Curated annotation (Swiss-Prot):
InterPro entries: eIF3i, WD40/YVTN_repeat-like_dom_sf, WD40_repeat_CS, WD40_repeat_dom_sf, WD40_rpt. It comes from the Eukaryota. It is found in: Cytoplasm. Keywords: Cytoplasm, Initiation factor, Protein biosynthesis, Repeat, WD repeat. WD repeats lie at residues 4-43, 46-85, 141-180, 184-223, 281-322. PROSITE patterns: WD_REPEATS_1, WD_REPEATS_2, WD_REPEATS_REGION. Component of the eukaryotic translation initiation factor 3 (eIF-3) complex, which is involved in protein synthesis of a specialized repertoire of mRNAs and, together with other initiation factors, stimulates binding of mRNA and methionyl-tRNAi to the 40S ribosome. The eIF-3 complex specifically targets and initiates translation of a subset of mRNAs involved in cell proliferation. PANTHER family: EUKARYOTIC TRANSLATION INITIATION FACTOR 3 SUBUNIT I. This is Eukaryotic translation initiation factor 3 subunit I. Component of the eukaryotic translation initiation factor 3 (eIF-3) complex. The eIF-3 complex interacts with pix. Belongs to the eIF-3 subunit I family. One of its GO terms (cellular component) is eukaryotic 48S preinitiation complex. GO terms for molecular function: RNA binding; translation initiation factor activity.
Amino acid sequence: MLQGHERSITQIKYNREGDLLFSSSKDQKPNVWYSLNGERLGTYDGHQGAVWCLDVDWESRKLITAGGDMTAKLWDVEYGTVIASIPTKSSVRTCNFSFSGNQAAYSTDKTMGQSCELFIIDVRNADSTLSEQTPTLRIPMTESKITSMLWGPLDETIITGHDNGNIAIWDVRKGQKVVDSGTDHTGVINDMQLSKDGTMFVTASKDATAKLFDSETLMCLKTYKTERPVNSAAISPILDHVVLGGGQDAMEVTTTSTKAGKFDSRFFHLIYEEEFARLKGHFGPINSLAFHPDGKSYASGGEDGFVRVQSFDSTYFENIFE
């Protein structure tokens, strides 16, 4: 159990090798941990508000964070210094590096009279002048705001999840929407995570379901049903498993009992859509989940401010569906 945040966790993410685990929370300070023994390596000080989202690039050199203080910040992972701070007109909700690491995308909230917008910036030779440079692409969202985002294959597209349950794919070169999912989800899309090969992604929604989609066509392949809002979902890199986490909305939580089973991590079979395991642990809703890149453990970040890393025992790998 990793204890280093004073307020609820908003997102956790492993780097590509899996030796580092990054966590962001509402307490303004993203942390980086050594995933093997849970040692905290450092914090990234600079935000003046909640940090909603973070992402680390392919080489673990740069970190991007999305802040409620109306800035997106680019950090040096090793030294913890701010490379660039990009001011926005409303709080930044999502951020992601492209696979190449040459570009980063971030989106702003639809608040205070500002519309939601998606920005793409070039981070190859990023320095403090990045805040004055014009983004390589800027797409205003006319309908509903973006609540989660992924880069598509070959850095050619961006997949966005919205607060009305819609999912769309945007062509990065043209700045146009190329695919729209329609109404597969009826609630806010809280999280989207790609499979290891990038051909599929799983969504987590407030409508109490997680769904598996094709990354190119947005065809809904599978649905994993629960009784409560799903805040996060992740796909195992080695087995046909999906883990879901959620619970009630934070403001509706009145009990701290873990016995009720509201705040468990729930494991489903990717193909058969059947739940086969639950793991307890958090005293409150789970806000973010991530599988370790080797698939032998997973991490969860909760409303209780803790990050829990749990390793699977041998029976997990021997579990064969009949």
